[in-house]
């Protein structure tokens, strides 16, 4: 679509958009029934205003970018009632359960999020739009149902940054702010971020109906996911086992991509794991700066359960939880009358699927690391070479992003060109030893230095959403200056490009960044 529509066209689009969202499509999650969700209006947000907006996501949703300039836009995406909203439309909060920090937490659910409807994208797919921070729901527990400005800006920026890194993720259309106060560790202001995804179904949705002994509803949910998102599973001998396998493999691929860019999710509870294998629920996340394999980005994670090095193991464990939830459905097609025999067969089949996680994750990460090192040919020693680099980085706390980006400057034949990356290491001798191994490996490659460097720069980002960059944007936004949110969003849309005018955004973090902490309080 063209971005040439006028503001008047955008004004005409608002009521059409609201009407579209109010008409659920056949097969939409909301049509599953009351056991899956509660329908309720959002809590009004006082005097809302636009903080951030993604024209790219608007384009995906077949909306003109000028729509954000319309007064009714902020009202609509704050969840406030508007004259354009259909009288019979009602957002919903879904119910799910889950394991949090490895402990069964029981019923959870959308405690501060409401899905307001679906819209067909320009790619032909159906996308759900969800307002995070839209007020209390029956699943809020002790929370107030609100999100604060800082966490909403972080989610908005990281959703789009991850997309442009090529990592599967929910998207973000807009952040709507308000001066309405909310109490966290201190008084903050409210905000609502509009998340966009084909589905917000989590592992925890399946755990909920399993734990409540409702195999009928569990099957209804699984059928919904298969028919809408994994139609190939319907053709398998056991569709539900195929669903487990598809979700497991996608999760393995996703976490391999996280590891390759130094991304830490921070709170990999089973209710924060997407059945589609996309990154969801950006809370206390972080990109590793000074590399530490044991890096913990979430201040609330006192045990280090979700540390960088633990993410693959935790993702695998979460898939076990999903498998347990799906056990009542696995093997139904086999016609085994004896329940115990069927259950035993289901466990064996599920275990065989779960064993594929490391088989998928390992090679996926090796391929990513080989590309990051600029290696076209496969050698058995490549994994050892990559691991040795990470060990050397860990020992020197070398910056993760800059190390991989600057590796492109290394020459096959000229060690003097090592200086930009070498300077990132405290132990220069250790780096030199590794660089010699690397140069020996490069001698087996056919590409010249320039071609290899170009390929490496296409997979090693120069710009990532470092915590201090987000913090600067947040501080300015609190003063009603949203220009840094927009500037940072624009930079992160081109993470692999040289942007000479924005070199400061690719620099090492300032000293004050070391004192920044992010937690589950948002």
From Swiss-Prot:
It catalyses: L-seryl-[protein] + ATP = 3-O-(5'-adenylyl)-L-seryl-[protein] + diphosphate; L-threonyl-[protein] + ATP = 3-O-(5'-adenylyl)-L-threonyl-[protein] + diphosphate; L-tyrosyl-[protein] + ATP = O-(5'-adenylyl)-L-tyrosyl-[protein] + diphosphate; L-histidyl-[protein] + UTP = N(tele)-(5'-uridylyl)-L-histidyl-[protein] + diphosphate. Its cofactor is Mg(2+); Mn(2+). InterPro entries: SelO (IPR003846). Mg(2+) binds at residues 272, 281. Nucleotidyltransferase involved in the post-translational modification of proteins. It can catalyze the addition of adenosine monophosphate (AMP) or uridine monophosphate (UMP) to a protein, resulting in modifications known as AMPylation and UMPylation. It comes from Burkholderia lata (strain ATCC 17760 / DSM 23089 / LMG 22485 / NCIMB 9086 / R18194 / 383). This is Protein nucleotidyltransferase YdiU. Its EC number is 2.7.7.-, 2.7.7.108. Keywords: ATP-binding, Magnesium, Manganese, Metal-binding, Nucleotide-binding, Nucleotidyltransferase, Transferase. The lineage of its organism: Bacteria, Pseudomonadati, Pseudomonadota, Betaproteobacteria, Burkholderiales. ATP binds at residues 109, 111-112, 132, 144-145, 195, 202, 281. The active site is at residue 271.
